[in-house]
Amino acid sequence: MRTNPLVLGVSALVEKNVGYIAQIIGPVLDVSFSPGYMPNIYNSLKVQGQGTAGQEIQVTCEVQQLLGNHKVRAVAMSATDGLTRGMTVIDTGAPLSVPVGGATLGRIFNVLGEPVDNLGPVDARITSPIHRTAPAFTELDTKLSIFETGIKVVDLLAPYRRGGKIGLFGGAGVGKTVLIMELINNIAKAHGGVSVFGGVGERTREGNDLYMEMKESGVIDEQKISESKVALVYGQMNEPPGARMRVGLTALTMAEYFRDVNEQDVLLFIDNIFRFVQAGSEVSALLGRMPSAVGYQPTLSTEMGSLQERITSTKKGSITSIQAVYVPADDLTDPAPATTFAHLDATTVLSRGLAAKGIYPAVDPLDSTSTMLQPWIVGEEHYETAQGVKQTLQRYKELQDIIAIPGLDELSEEDRLIVARARKIERFLSQPFFVAEVFTGSPGKYVGLMETIRGFQMILSGELDGLTEQSFYLVGNIDEATVRLNSTGK
């Protein structure tokens, strides 16, 4: 049996609390420590040594279980290739800590808070542990307020709550990334806020594409990196489950610093929240826990709650979270999406049909929902306008079959008017984005909520029945539609 170096009485080692690897099962390590020197749950452990090929090894693990017999079970945050039994393991005495603050903006990090963008080291003087309790109830800002995004379809029909959680549903190629980048741009310009993007268990190519598009659109400023509007944290598909399970907490920790210390409004993007659950399920099985429904971890609700409850508004600032939600096999009753839905305040659904028509953002106005769309929260005027828009679009949807076969001429005069207004509304829900200027050549538009409401009221009332549909396509506020008519004469 290997002697624990701690027992040898070497003072330098005693100070650091050293153990050794007793067993390795994939990304899970069992580590032996001396009696009385056991690390705490969630403590960060560092494995140091030389691999079988002579390469230097530095692996960080997180303690998950205390097994008895002076052993702990830990999950590795990086590949365990080259590790052997008997290797030295140092207990850092604290949970994993990551850099926070302005130094993180414009940079890409891994789960450990290490920069992975080849732009040199990060100023890590200010760090914060990734495991924290949610803010106390007395610190919360319980006032219900709308988070204005400047995007017409979102603000009118499925408004976001300040400090709320929003689910973003959409397949490939319907504009999720562009919508995310526009939100990052708008919070920076209109609210003086910053954003943190957590790539959880998605494709490495997508992470790279997002980074390149952010640089191209100016969200990340290569010349003045500190003036960038977003910090990126990636734990992609090829990472071990421990990294994918914790990368969301790393991103959240960076966002919490901007909220609590800088007192800013923060947008936190998590893509994809399902992968967070999936990674937790893998780790749970590796730790030997009995699986629950559909093979998920028995601690599913607890893990989801501990992440989601930290995303909230306090009296200092807010974290508003937008989470892409993958629904396995389109089954909304699957425990992973079902547990996520319990925490969401709004859903933004992107439609391939609208994208095919060229209407961007391709947000489905009838499928997207929000708990904030209540008359006592948004006001009677906003609520009535939103309901009028939805009723008009719903009637248009019901008439589609008649329009497709016999044609518009078979409709009553009233229905023809509804169809004409619905088509104008559909086009007015489109909007030129700031981050898409480089692709479209059209200058981006931020539309305030009152301007949005006024525009849709004018369409619903019939004031603009004389304008063509094309006048409403890709404009900002309603005045631009009338100006376009006068300038083109159409």
UniProtKB/Swiss-Prot annotation:
Enzyme Commission number(s) from the entry: 7.1.2.2
GO MF term list: ATP binding; ATP hydrolysis activity; proton-transporting ATP synthase activity, rotational mechanism
Pfam families recorded: ATP-synt_ab, ATP-synt_ab_N, ATP-synt_VA_C
EC class name: translocase
Cysteine disulfide links: none
UniProt keywords, alphabetically: ATP synthesis, ATP-binding, CF(1), Chloroplast, Hydrogen ion transport, Ion transport, Membrane, Nucleotide-binding, Plastid, Thylakoid, Translocase, Transport
Superkingdom of the source species: Eukaryota
Membrane topology type: Peripheral membrane protein
Residues binding ATP, per UniProt: G170, G171, A172, G173, V174, G175, K176, T177
Function: Produces ATP from ADP in the presence of a proton gradient across the membrane. The catalytic sites are hosted primarily by the beta subunits.
HAMAP family attached to this UniProt entry: ATP_synth_beta_bact
Protein's recorded name: ATP synthase subunit beta, chloroplastic
Species annotation: Pinus koraiensis
